[in-house]
Structures are given as C-alpha cells and as structure tokens.
Design a protein with these regions (language model features):
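Gly/Ser-rich catalytic/binding loops embedded in alpha/beta enzyme cores
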Residues: 1-78, 185-188, 193, 289
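Conserved alpha-helical elements of sugar-nucleotide-dependent glycosyltransferases
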Residues: 6, 175-182, 326, 369
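Structural helix-boundary/capping segments
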Residues: 12, 16, 67-73, 78-174, ...
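Short glycine/threonine-rich loop-to-helix capping motif typified by GTGT followed
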Residues: 177-179, 209-218, 313-319
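General small-molecule cofactor/ligand-binding pocket signal
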Residues: 22, 196-201
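Serine-dependent amide/ester hydrolase catalytic core
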Residues: 26, 170-172, 205, 228-336, ...
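Short basic, glycine-rich beta-strand/loop surfaces that mediate nucleic-acid
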Residues: 41, 211-218, 355-365
C-alpha cells in the first residue's frame, strides 16, 4: 500500500495527457529476474495459461494488459524486461533508445542499461504512448531527446526498399525449433510486404550474456548500497546497534536473487578482479556496439528472436539461475548497445499453445522505422489479436 512521494517523469507526462493511473504492477524484485518468481509479493501468472510464467521482470505489466485489466502499461527494460514478457504474453512492446525517455523516478537497477517503455496489444498503441513519454527531462542527465518521437509517417503497409538483416547464428542449436520456424515465417511476411531480407553473421553473441551480467550486477551493487536501513529502504526492527541495523536490514530486506547479483557485482568491482572481469566486460560492450554499427551500415533493422523458447512453467527455471540468465541471450545486447527494439507476436507454439514473439532491432532513434515495419506486419497478420484463457 506504499504511495510514492512523487511521480516519475514518464508518469507525469501521461497524467498531463489525461491518463488514468489504475495501479502498480507486480515485477521481479528490483527488476532482477525473468519470470516474476523473485517478486516479494508472489508470482504473477500468465493469462494464457495459469501454470506458466508471464516473463519478467515487467511480468505484472504484461499480464495486466494480456488479461484486459488495462489497455497499456509501462515497463522497464534493462536486459529484456519489456520484450520478453511481451513475447510470453502475446503482446507488443518497445524498448526505446537509451536516453529517449526520462528515467527520473525509476528505481535504478543498472543505470547505463535501464530504459522505460510501453507495453500494449499492438504497435500503434505502443507508439502513441511512446510519443507521450519521450522527450527531454532536465532531471535526468541521460535524457538526450529535445522533442518526442513522431510516428505520423510510420503507419503504412508498404515496406518496399526496407532492408532487414537476419543474423543466422541467432537461429542455431540453442533455439527451440518451433520458435525458429515461427520467426522465419514472420520474416516471410515482411518479405511479402516488400522488405529485402538478407542473412548475415552477427559476431559476439556468445559474449553478450556474461558481459551483460557483469556490467549490470556491478552497477546494481552500487545502486542498491543505499538500501541500508538508515538512509533508505527497509529497516529491521529487532536490532541492538548501528552495525546490526545495517546487517539485518540488508539480510532481511533483499531476496536471494538480489543478494546473488549484489555479491556478484561487488566481486567483479573488487581490486583483485576489476581488470579480469569488469574491464573486459566493458570492452565486450564496446565490441557489441561496433558490431551493431557495422550491421546498420547494410541494413535498416535486424530481425531476431526475443527468447529461445516460449513461456515455461512456473518453477521450471527458478532453481537454475544460469539457465534463466542464458534465456536473455537475444535481448541483452540491445541494452548493452543502447539501441531500440520492438517485440511483437508472430505465432503460437504447437507444443504448449503459448505465444511466440520476435523482435525488430534498429539503430539509435530509429523507432519510427521499427514501428513502420511492425505496423505493416500487424496489418496483414492477426497474431496480436489472439487472446489466452482469460
């Protein structure tokens, strides 16, 4: 029942435009997770099938929209936390260019990766919300857009002349065969709309997940150090002195996944391991950005999976953190590079009758082009119109 003392920059803009705030949605603790199973408040269930996870970390936002509790929602995307829930819940979501939407009021997980974006039933709804929340904010030093996005030229069905790259190594042995087939079928739809598709090799994907978790956890260990029970956050009641206040407040106030990432971040930032891990991760991050830059010299955008599988059952991965981390393999590189991506539905799995999503990745501030491609796709398909059991 906590009521925030102030609104975020994104919410201020929505309320100014007349939006009605229905409530706060469940999510993984401090955005650390991909299923909402790490949430302090309990697990959110996927409206398509209550035995399955809705994705995360913004799983509550996605579930609310999928269950028709709200026409749209906001989420935060640090390594895929908007796009993966959209893929699992048959929704559309936009992870905007870093700096295009104010992070003022967003509880920081990894400050150089976090970005707020919309979740909705279709890309036009998401684009309208992104128009409202994008633009400059002096309270966020990373805010770089002087004007909001303009999508007025994006609502066309003709993609003639648009060049889309397909990184063929993204579709190797690690991806579920049905997910691969649905996404490649979606590529065929884009080709039918006039887009030129070409396969290519995107180097460096094997380094994306370890580099991401080193950078993200390092920043998290710093950002979450403020939760000490004195200056900020939960305070344990049964304490004898200041030291015990710090110790018990942090021990009792953080869940196991948050503790794991804080410890990992503290480890890679320590003097003995800084060069061996953190410095190398930053070098990999630069390499990933350069690889995207080279790809965008040839292609207007890249078509990629969101997740190697469709949604999985509750409890299947929570005991195996490494498996959960590796599920982010297709999304984290976008955050490391700071570029935008749109996730949208492209089919239903025959194995478990759960949704399958794909993503379109673009260069900095290419959201209008991404929306154009996604809009054209959704005009000739009905995947986004299908609903689950609710």
């Amino acid at each position: 029942n906590f009521v925030p003392p102030y609104s975020s920059g994104a919410m201020e803009k929505l309320e100014k435009a007349g939006a009605v705030v229905l409530g706060k949605a469940n999510m993984d603790e401090f955005a650390m997770g991909g299923s909402t199973e790490t949430s302090y408040f309990g697990i959110t269930k996927n409206p398509w099938n209550m035995e399955y996870v809705p994705g995360g970390s913004s799983g509550g936002s996605a579930a609310a929209v999928a269950a028709n509790m709200a026409p749209y929602a906001l989420g935060s995307d640090t390594g895929g936390s908007i796009r993966q829930p959209c893929a699992f819940c048959n929704l559309t979501g936009i992870k905007p260019t870093y700096g295009s939407v104010s992070r003022y009021g967003l509880m920081a997980y990894a400050s150089s990766l976090d970005q707020i974006g919309p979740i909705g039933k279709n890309v036009q709804d998401c684009a309208e919300i992104l128009t409202l929340i994008s633009g400059t904010d002096k309270r966020d030093s990373t805010s770089v857009m002087e004007r909001p996005f303009d999508f007025s030229d994006s609502y066309r069905e003709d993609l003639k002349g648009m060049k889309i790259g397909i990184p063929i190594n993204y579709f190797g042995s690690g991806i579920n065969h049905e997910v691969r087939e649905k996404i490649l079928a979606g590529a065929g739809v884009l080709r039918g709309l006039g887009a030129e598709l070409q396969e290519f090799e995107m180097p460096g994907i094997e380094y994306a997940v370890p580099a991401y978790y080193i950078v993200a956890c390092a920043e998290a260990s710093s950002n979450l150090s403020r939760y000490d029970g004195i200056k900020y956050g939960f305070r344990s009641k049964n304490v004898k002195d200041l030291r015990e206040t710090y110790y018990k407040s942090r021990s009792e106030g953080f869940g196991s996944e948050a503790k794991r990432r804080i410890m990992l971040g503290s480890f890679v930032l320590s003097s003995g391991y800084f060069d061996a891990y953190y410095k190398k991760a930053l070098q990999v991050r630069t390499m990933i950005k350069e690889n995207f830059n080279k790809a965008f010299e040839k292609y207007d955008m890249i078509l990629s999976p969101v997740s190697p599988t469709a949604a999985y059952k509750i409890g299947e991965q929570i005991s195996d953190p490494l498996a959960m981390y590796m599920a982010d393999i297709y999304t984290v590189s976008v955050n490391l590079a700071g570029i935008p991506a749109v996730a949208l539905p492209c089919g239903i799995s025959d194995e478990n009758n759960m949704p399958v999503g794909m993503q379109l990745i673009g260069n900095n501030f290419s959201e209008p082009a991404l929306v154009k491609a996604a809009y054209a796709f959704q005009q000739v398909t009905n995947f986004h119109k299908r609903g689950g059991i609710l």
